[in-house]
Swiss-Prot record:
Catalytic activity of the protein: UDP-N-acetyl-alpha-D-muramate + NADP(+) = UDP-N-acetyl-3-O-(1-carboxyvinyl)-alpha-D-glucosamine + NADPH + H(+)
MF GO annotations: FAD binding; UDP-N-acetylmuramate dehydrogenase activity
Name of the molecule in the record: UDP-N-acetylenolpyruvoylglucosamine reductase
Function summary: Cell wall formation.
NCBIfam families, per the entry: PRK13903.1
GO cellular component, one term: cytosol
InterPro entries named in the record: FAD-bd_PCMH, FAD-bd_PCMH-like_sf, FAD-bd_PCMH_sub1, FAD-bd_PCMH_sub2, MurB, MurB_C, MurB_C_sf, Oxid_FAD_bind_N
Record has Flavoprotein as a keyword: yes
Species of the source: Corynebacterium jeikeium (strain K411)
Gene responsible for this protein: murB
Amino acid sequence: MTDSTNNAHFTSEERARHLLERLSGTGADSVSIPGTRVTSRSFAEMTTLRIGAAPAGVVECSSAEAVAQVVSFLDAHTQPLLIVGGGSNLVVGEGDEVSQLVVVLMSAGGGEGGVDKKGAAEKSAEGDVMIDRETGVVRAFAGVEWDQLVAATVEAGLGGLECLSGIPGSVGATPVQNVGAYGAEVAQVLRRVQLYDRTRGELEWVDPSALDLGYRYSNLKFTSRAVVTAVEFQLTTDGLSVPLRFGELARRLGVDADEAAAGEIRRPATDVRQAVLELRAGKGMVLDSADHDTWSAGSFFTNPIVTGEEARDAVVAAVREKCGDAEAESMPLYSVKSSGGDASGGGAGASVGEPQYKFSAAWLIERAGFAKGWHVPGNERASLSTKHTLALTNRGSATSADVVELARAVRTGVREAFGVVLEPEPIWVGVSID
């Protein structure tokens, strides 16, 4: 039988539509893949920033096998595609590049994001989530909502994810970005990751060591070679949190600063989760459709990392010149482990063992003159959050151009003030900050 999709007279849009018809079972040479559904949505509906045009179509997938089969089918026809989970780390444009895409949307099945909260012995390895209370091993389909997984693990008496409570998005994005907050990151509890290798056409489990994990980075972040389909974590079974090292969170829980610095203090994971949710809500970092401060891609810039004492001292000197001695002495500045030259942000090119130093992007943004709620003069459609300077927000009618204009203004201002180039954290589709 001839594959009608290979018709050379198809335009890009026509080819995408024809492939979607085949996947939906309504076109010629229809393809039936269990656990899939073809639908139409705009990126404004699929992302937390709520901007972006509509792609050619959306294929919802409710299992790793469905994702693998759909991606394989689209790749076989050289169809441009984008994998989307919670849409919390995307900035999407409105041009032709976007309208020609087919989105493969990870969508967990069942209620509460597919999280089964029964005893470990009753859990099915074929479900969206498997939690083993005895060993602390947790496995989740990539499409499960992240915070619902965190809530389920805390409720099950496991510790390790509580500091990452309230982060929007899906499980599959967490190892790609090496998601982190309040002194914890996914790399600390990651056991293994299931990938669909698009080159070999195979599903496989890989160890964290294969991902080159760094600060808000993995080697999956800027490549389309593989798709995360499931993630497995190793959590603790004593019901206690990870050590409380982040000052703001430690203070919220009544932990002395010196004790927190020692990195030995742990608290019940349930208490830590509640404290984190309260802190995030106060910064507009918990999704609320009625609050434009939450219409964002989360923390927009990564905390900059510089290599070597000379680079560190240059930033401190610039702060001292602009803001005075008191600010220079009290600015947030942390020594971090050398990345050995990976692309994890700021530390690229560092030799092994060379000291690296991390600054607070939010602190630098504010000291460069960008207050909470700041917007480009004459354009109020996009602004910094009124609660947190690190979030760039859609005030209700912003386009990608508005967000880019705001991001460029902030990045330029920080560079001119302190000589630091802020790196954006989101993935850009059909639009660029450069």
